[in-house]
Amino acid sequence: MNRFNLSLLITSLLLQFLGYSVNGQEYPCEKTMVESLQHTAWVLNKPESKALWNVSLNAPIIIIDHFNNKMFFTSIEDGRVQAIKEEPWDNKVPLANSFFDYEGKRYVTIIHAALMNSPCQQRINLLSHEIFHTYQKSLGIENQYSVNYYMDEVQGRALLQIELKALQAALSGDSMRLHDALYIRTYRQSLYPNNNEDLYELNEGLAEYTGVKLSTENMQEYVKNRLNYDISRGYTNAFGYFTGSAYATILDQIYAEWRYDKDLAKGLIYLIKKAEPQYAVTINKSTLDKLLIKYDYAQIVANEKEELKSFGDIEKFKDLLKPETSKLCIANQKINFTYNPNDRVISLGDAVLLRNMSIMGEWGQIKAKNGIVRMNNWSAFYLLPPTNITNNAIQGDSYEIQINQGWKVVEEHGIYSIVKE
């Protein structure tokens, strides 16, 4: 699976839908799966929904009930839900809120538990978000995976926190706070020139904006609440959902036609500055210093440094990047994987440390619960060396691997791999 396809699985898991309320709804939704699909189909078929992007948001859908090993096939077409067909899941489709090509056809994929454990309006949000992803290319918006790993480093997180605080006030019409948010953002991006914040924000932020816009009555309040900073959350993948929907909501206030602008693909910040040129930023040290004091940057940094200690011994995973260090290597060949994009990601230079991940390949399945290294070029994944190996299983420090028949573990000079027998 190439890097492009992998990114579709990673950035669209949207596990953060679990636990969020819409308009104060925290009670369970009593609608059945079919009723929720019908409700969503009705919403998407409304004239104002079609007018949002000048497209009809129809899509084939697979809903994956992994607890009962079932897949439900259906589609939303012009306000109607097509007859549902069921077949065994058997890991044939990645467990993700995303989209996936299956047997020659592209489907939106939805985790049954993520759908059914959400409030009623949030179900519309989830479905609309993922359906938007299948249409975004027609709007000039490319699928992107986040390379903004500094969002989980101390300085990057501290500056993001200031941007989120300023954005919350900006949503209420405070133009000075919008300037603050854009100033800090510009400064952060100058520190990390290889970022793709603006493009990733388009990818996930506009999908989030679409889902919220079609499901929530008080959109401004919802988006504000999503900007509340959580020091334990990972932001490398999550930030774009929050900042993107916030800047899109601000554009609704200052530039009503922004969704149809020919320069949409250049980013939301570009459109804000195009509509309101006074928000263009030139970094000045004196102004920057005053802004950092205003938002108590020093204390934010101190808090971030303390929180980083909770991740454990990062150095033992960084050592896996050394050629001579014993490790289990998983090559990126014909694999699918999922992980929680809410979780924190630690940059290791040429790789990142993820807290947990599931990987599926023709050789079997990995469940890593507390640390797995992924190379930045996506070529391989590294785990700490195994502590126990049997014919069909590998156990290590907080990970388990089930090995399929016809495969085995081999070791050479301390480097473990899974190969065909």
Model-derived features: positions:
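Catalytic zinc-binding patch centered on the HExxH motif and its immediate surroundings
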Residues: 84-105, 117
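Active-site-proximal alpha-helical
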Residues: 191-221, 226-286, 290
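Post-HExxH zinc-binding segment in Zn-dependent metallohydrolases
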Residues: 138-193, 197-223
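Non-catalytic terminal regions of proteins
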Residues: 263-421
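N-terminal mature-domain "stem" immediately C-terminal to a signal peptide or N-terminal signal-anchor/transmembrane
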Residues: 25-83, 207
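Short pre-active-site segment immediately N-terminal to the catalytic Zn-binding motif
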Residues: 112-127
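Active-site recognition of the HExxH zinc-binding catalytic motif
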Residues: 125-137
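Bacterial N-terminal signal peptides
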Residues: 9-17
